[in-house]
């Protein structure tokens, strides 16, 4: 043996021993799933600790080539150890360039390379020793069904997993035309494949999460906006019901007006997209073949042009009522009690509409106070309620106008915020909560009835039942504006900006939240995790209940809900009840009646309505005058 070889021997031996010891010291980083082994990574958290993250685990075969627009197939097994140390590609989607470089926009844009090979999920696990039977919380991102990615910083699951000792899971799913383009009767483009992506990820959780220390019988799905609507859609869909235990819906429900379309409207939009990209010939098969051969960006560039009108809070390719995933329309299923019987926690933010006003409503901008003229207000109402006829628009204007001060720019601005938020988020969610609570009460009164009575279908293909003996509803209003928010003050507590508190970002000192905001975030994480564990946000891990004021159940009669902010908890009754009566009851009836009248009668009713509004305004002014101090005799 050469002298140089002898000198190298200790180095080689030391290297071997180091790697061998390191591998033996970190068995928690490698998990054997049903599909194959995955290797994760340690991520730091405050308190000088860490979580173990498995990032970018494939759950489906890539939906590329001929698989575009089709339901994804489950991932095939692999032999080698899969490196799950970085987030995967983001799914192809629209990228918002309205305010380039502005953090309030960029935080929602994809932060990974976009690809159609994007069906991956992530798992965050509390540190060793390896846990067992931990509660699992599965996040579904929002983004109007046209955008979103599980890799966004605001969805980082490490803080929630570490603080509450739960297993956090998130998944990518296809969005836009890739996830929701639909042609009735076509197996090549059946629609709702983005929802089926989510379901496939939930099936992966059922089959594999116990390898990571999670309990497959204790899975709560939660999401925001379109993600919350998706959560609600799984609550409705019979084949999804066995795959989770409870549900949390943040600022979204399946019955909201932007969340679904009919098959006829879906076909119209698909055909329109084909024309826009040059696929104008042949039958359905040829149309889909042509669309499959287009570069993804070509489809994205034309996506917004398929909408039937210029509007606010409407999106091009969304879930379709197909008779399969949805046996009926969400409204019909909710009204008949045809949904999973379990516990739900849901709520809204104070200013749900303000974000969407920046995308087309005249006079609105992030760079000024957006004081809105009466003319711009009336034009914005038309965009905000695109399905309404003139009589319906007049009803909305009447409800939201302060007739003592109708030209006040601030009041017009805030009224538009309320119109968009009430119609698209708050009032559909209130209706969902009331219907759910009503059927929960009926079911409690008829607990001796056979399973499935009153439409409470827990059973799916496996007959799995959540194990809780009762349903319950908990409702919140999030009304804290973060101290470091980049958006202007007039936008208030914006749609989507409770998420950072749910995921614990205020625990990260470098992000410059206040101490009070860190406490609020810890409180919200505790509520969410308590609910996921027990079905009650008040019940802690050890079975104790918080000594402070408790979060009451929501009932259809009292409609109790809590405010979530940095102040001590307060309980309120009724969530914008008067305004929601317009959207949930009066306006649908009004449009149903007036849509069938001829133009002459319609014009007469419009003029009569305007006259009534004028008389109401005149009476208000007269009453105001009458209350003033009268002139004294000279």
Swiss-Prot record:
Which terms does the record give in the GO molecular function aspect?
acetylcholinesterase activity
- Look up and give the membrane topology term: Peripheral membrane protein
- GO-annotated cellular components: extracellular space; plasma membrane; synapse
Question: Where located?
Answer: Synapse; Secreted; Cell membrane
List the EC numbers from the record.
3.1.1.7
Q: Which residues form the active site?
A: 225, 352, 495
| UniProt xrefs under SUPFAM superfamilies | alpha/beta-Hydrolases
Binding partners and assembly: Dimers and collagen-tailed forms, in which catalytic tetramers are associated with anchoring proteins that attach them to the basal lamina or to cell membranes. In the collagen-tailed forms, subunits are associated with a specific collagen, COLQ, which triggers the formation of isoform T tetramers from dimers.
Which family does the similarity line name?
Belongs to the type-B carboxylesterase/lipase family.
Protein name per the record = Acetylcholinesterase
Q: Which gene encodes it?
A: ache
């Amino acid at each position: 043996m050469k002298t140089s070889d002898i000198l190298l021997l200790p180095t080689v031996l030391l290297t071997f021993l180091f790697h061998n010891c390191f591998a033996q010291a970190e068995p928690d980083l490698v998990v054997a799933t049903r599909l194959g082994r995955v290797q994760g990574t340690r991520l730091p958290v405050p308190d000088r600790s860490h979580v173990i993250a498995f990032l970018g685990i494939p759950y489906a075969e890539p939906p590329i080539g001929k698989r575009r627009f089709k339901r994804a197939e489950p991932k095939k097994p692999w032999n080698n150890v899969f490196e799950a140390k970085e987030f995967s590609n983001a799914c192809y989607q629209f990228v918002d360039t309205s305010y380039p470089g502005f953090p309030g926009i960029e935080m929602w844009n994809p932060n990974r390379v976009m690809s159609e090979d994007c069906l991956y999920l992530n798992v965050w696990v509390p540190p060793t020793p390896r846990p067992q039977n931990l509660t699992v919380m599965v996040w579904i991102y929002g983004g109007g069904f046209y955008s979103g990615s599980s890799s966004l910083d605001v969805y980082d699951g490490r803080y929630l997993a570490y603080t509450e000792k739960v297993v956090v899971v998130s998944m990518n799913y296809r969005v836009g035309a890739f996830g929701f383009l639909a042609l009735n009767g076509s197996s090549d483009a059946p629609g709702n494949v983005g929802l089926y992506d989510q379901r496939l990820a939930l099936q992966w959780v059922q089959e594999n999460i116990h390898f990571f220390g999670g309990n497959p019988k204790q899975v709560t799905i939660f999401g925001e906006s379109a993600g919350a609507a998706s959560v609600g859609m799984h609550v409705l869909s019979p084949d999804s019901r066995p795959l989770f235990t409870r549900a949390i819906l943040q600022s979204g429900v399946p019955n909201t007006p932007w969340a679904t379309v009919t098959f006829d409207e879906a076909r119209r939009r698909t055909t329109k997209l084909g024309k826009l990209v040059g696929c104008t010939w042949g039958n359905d098969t040829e149309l889909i073949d042509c669309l499959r051969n287009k570069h993804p960006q070509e489809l994205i560039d034309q996506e917004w042009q398929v909408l039937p009108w210029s509007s606010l809070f409407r999106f091009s390719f969304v879930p379709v009522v197909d008779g399969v995933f949805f046996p009926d329309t969400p409204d019909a299923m909710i009204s008949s009690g045809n949904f999973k019987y379990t516990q739900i926690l849901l709520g809204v933010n104070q200013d749900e509409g303000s974000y969407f006003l920046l995308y087309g409503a005249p006079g609105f901008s992030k760079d000024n106070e957006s004081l809105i003229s009466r003319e711009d207000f009336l034009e914005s109402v038309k965009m905000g309620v695109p399905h309404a006829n003139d009589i319906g628009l007049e009803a909305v204007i009447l409800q939201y106008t302060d007739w003592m001060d109708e030209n006040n720019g601030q009041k017009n601005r805030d009224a538009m915020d309320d119109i968009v938020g009430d119609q698209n988020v708050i009032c559909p969610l209130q209706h969902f909560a009331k219907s759910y609570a009503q059927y929960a009460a009926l079911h409690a009164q008829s607990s001796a009835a056979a399973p499935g009575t009153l439409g409470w279908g827990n059973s799916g293909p496996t007959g799995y039942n959540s194990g809780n003996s009762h349903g319950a509803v908990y409702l919140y209003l999030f009304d804290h504006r973060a101290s470091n928010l980049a958006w202007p003050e007039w936008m208030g507590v914006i749609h989507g900006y409770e998420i950072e508190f749910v995921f614990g970002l205020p625990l990260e000192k470098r992000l410059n939240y206040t101490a009070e905001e860190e406490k609020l975030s810890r409180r919200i994480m505790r509520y969410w995790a308590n609910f996921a564990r027990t079905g009650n946000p008040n019940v802690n891990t050890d079975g104790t209940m918080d000594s402070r004021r408790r979060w009451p159940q929501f009932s259809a009669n009292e409609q109790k809900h809590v405010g979530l902010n940095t102040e001590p908890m307060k309980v309120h009754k009724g969530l914008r009840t008067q305004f929601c009566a317009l959207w949930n009851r009066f306006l649908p009836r009004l449009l149903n009646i007036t849509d069938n009248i001829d133009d002459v009668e319609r014009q007469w009713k419009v003029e009569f309505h305007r006259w009534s509004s004028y008389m109401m305004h005149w009476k208000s002014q007269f009453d105001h005058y009458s209350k003033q101090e009268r002139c004294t005799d000279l």
